[in-house]
Amino acid sequence: MRVVVAMSGGVDSSAAAALLKEQGHEVIGITLRVWSYEGKATCGSCCSPDDIDDARAVAQTLGIPFYVANAEEIFQDRVINPFVQSYLGGRTPIPCVACNRDVKFNFLLKRARALGARLATGHYARVEEVDGRFVLRRAVDAAKDQSYFLFTLGQDELRDILFPVGGMTKAEVRAVAERHGLVTSQKPESMEICFVPDGDYAGFVEKVAGPQPAGDIVDTEGNVLGTHQGIHRYTVGQRKGLNLGGGEIRYVHRLEPETQRVVVGPAEGTGRDNFGLLQPHWVDGPPPASQPVEVRIRHRHSGAQGRVHVSPHGLVSVKLDAPARAVTPGQAAVVYDQDRVLGGGWIV
């Protein structure tokens, strides 16, 4: 079988390529160039010139062909621009989902299919075929599971996608890379968004969109408590960085882009047990309203029990059994049935 491996320059995709080569497949390595480096912020893991060099070195060690594909235009259009606009609109985006949906599993999958190949990545997730339908499941290594970022995949994509490391632990993945003598075997992980490696999201937004208008920080009654330098600097549930002096501890309840106000209050005011989902996507159809499900409202969220209701017009609402703290507009809510990903959408 011919397989294109999306090689990020990290240990996971390196091990994925090695495993497929061991299994006798015809493996082709491709790294996506998603960022121009001159005059822009340094790009982090999976994007930088050093990562491209590491991916090339791994391909040479494994004896597989290697190519670099330019995806800068689609990355700018589908990932960078929506990321910035979300922050300016008072939402907290999660660009990795958009990158997976539009870049890795659209742009790159199309190119793999044009070569008569399937596409493999280093994601920690699993795909199984059950009665002719494809099921997306959590990874075996719960601490590394990345299924949350993959809820936009559907039957058409899953039939041609492989996740070779999804059934392994991180230690086992590193052992595979070590056994093959790959330069990435002990490479550290990056926990930040790849195009904002220093974690300064507000600074990145300002580099792209320029200085943003200041506004008031108010309590839930509308009383002015202080000022801020742009709502893009805040997210729902945030406590640090409000600079309101002493007194009671306050948290961000909501952001109002129309008035440029940041509304704050006590911790209990950040909880929500119901919310809607924009642009819902289901891996193989939505769950019935009577079915109990687990809902993860951010990547590191342990999950909350609840139910999902889909109206005849496709509008989706989530009702949790108990309020969850910091349900944040712009983040993804992903719906699970045990280890099976059912789908999800964007919190409003």
Swiss-Prot record:
Q: Extract the NCBIfam families matched here.
A: PRK00143.1, trmU
Give the originating organism: Myxococcus xanthus (strain DK1622)
EC numbers for this chain? 2.8.1.13
Q: List the disulfide bonds.
A: 99-194
HAMAP family linked = tRNA_thiouridyl_MnmA (MF_00144)
Site label Interaction with tRNA, positions: 123, 331
Would you identify the family this protein belongs to, as annotated? Belongs to the MnmA/TRMU family.
Q: What class of enzyme is it?
A: transferase
Q: Which GO terms describe its molecular function?
A: ATP binding; tRNA binding; tRNA-uridine 2-sulfurtransferase activity
The cross-references to Gene3D superfamilies, in alphabetical order and at most eight, read:
Adenine nucleotide alpha hydrolases-like domains, HUPs, Translation factors
Taxonomic lineage: Bacteria, Pseudomonadati, Myxococcota, Myxococcia, Myxococcales
Tell me where in or outside the cell this protein is found: Cytoplasm
The protein's name is: tRNA-specific 2-thiouridylase MnmA
